[in-house]
Structure formats: C-alpha cells, structure tokens
C-alpha cells in the first residue's frame, strides 16, 4: 500500500461523505463496481491520472482538490 494512494483515497472518501454520497453512488456515476471505489479509498489501488479525473468528475470537484495537501 502506497502512502500517496492512501492519502488520495482518504481525501476522496472525505469529499464523498461530505456530499452525502455512498460508494455506490460514485461507482454508478463512473460506471464501475462499488468495490473498485472501496479499494481506491482504502489505498489498495493506485489510480491513474485518468481515474483521478473520473473520480473528480463524479464528485463534481476540481481534480486539484483530490491531489493537493
């Protein structure tokens, strides 16, 4: 598990929860399985730039909000 991936996943999860969205909601917006979102949020998967863009779009936030400290 990569520390950067874990931090990214925690940011994505925090934003998702603040918006009142479930992992299933985000997964549906991205057309992926809920377990894929879960693995990203837990830092198990190292998302590509394209996936980060898709997550940002699904969460309706600028990509920078997901990757900046």
Roles of regions detected by a PLM:
Residues 12, 26-27, 37-40, 66:
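Conserved hydrophobic/aromatic packing and binding residues within compact polymer-binding modules
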Residues 12, 23, 34, 49-52:
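Helix-turn-helix DNA-binding elements, focusing on the entry/boundary residues of the two helices
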Residues 1-7:
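A detector for short, charged/polar N-terminal pre-domain segments
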Residues 50-65:
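DNA major-groove recognition helix of helix-turn-helix/homeodomain DNA-binding modules
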Residues 32-46:
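Recognition helix of helix-turn-helix/homeodomain-like DNA-binding domains
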């Amino acid at each position: 598990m990569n520390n950067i991936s874990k931090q990214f996943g925690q940011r994505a999860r925090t934003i998702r929860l603040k918006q009142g969205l479930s992992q299933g909601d985000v997964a549906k917006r991205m057309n992926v399985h809920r377990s894929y979102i879960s693995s990203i949020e837990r830092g198990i998967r190292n998302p590509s730039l394209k996936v980060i863009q898709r997550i940002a779009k699904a969460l309706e936030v600028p990509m920078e909000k997901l990757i900046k400290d």
